[in-house]
Amino acid sequence: ARPSMTGAGRVHNFGAGPAVLPLEVVSEVAEALPNLSDSGFGLLEVSHRSEVFQSVIDSAEERVRRVLSVPGDYHVLFLQGGASTQFYMTALNLLGEAGKADFLVTGGWSQKAIKEAGRVGDVQSAWDGSGDGFVSVPSNGDYVIRDDADYVHYTSNNTLFGTQFHHLPDSGGKPRVVDASSDICGVPLDISSHDLVYAGAQKNLGPSGVTLVIISPWAISKIGD
């Protein structure tokens, strides 16, 4: 017998992702599969360039802006490739030919992030917790950011080791970039204090397959270079 969508037969998933979706969301998706917004097209059949699908994107962006209090001059993007793709895409767009980035390495995901960014430009660990087995995150004052760093990258919550920032990391006045995949919308996040926020959807936002990226006017100007 198939598990009931009413909850009694559903299995709870304690994995870090994909996340369990609310029954209301699952039911709404089920209704949209054969007929999206009374368009006559199913959700998986409708053109991604159509007005009816654009309304889905617009609604998602409006909710992201409202829930996260995204400043009006920031851009909200829904991209492919997962959060891991942003490890090097962020560096590729923000560092340029001679850029530098400093990283706070607090777990496995931030290790992966600095490794990928190192393929693009000059990166260094301003703080690295690997020597102690990643049992903590740094306090402000435990590290020094290079004067010529273009930005500072950190991972808000490393699920592999359970190291989570409960404060806004000091960036030495440099733009902040954060991988917020595993706690976005779960804890307060001041978007205006960051110039690029990215998060894979499957842990806190929804099903896998899309990455949320929020970028500031400064980041847009760097990408333009």
Tell what function each PLM region has:
Residues A1-R10:
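Basic/polar N-terminal segments that are highly enriched at the extreme N-terminus
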Residues T6-G7, S59, G72, L196-A199:
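Generic hydrophobic-segment detector
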Residues R10-E61:
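A glycine-/small-polar-enriched, mobile loop at the entrance of the PLP active site in fold-type I
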Residues G15, A19, L23, F78, ...:
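Conserved PLP-enzyme active-site core in the AAT-like
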Residues E31-D38, E62, R66-V70, R119-D122, ...:
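Generic secondary-structure signature for well-ordered alpha-helical cores
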Residues G40-Q86, N93, G107-G108, E116:
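Conserved N-terminal alpha-helix of the aminotransferase class I/II PLP-enzyme fold
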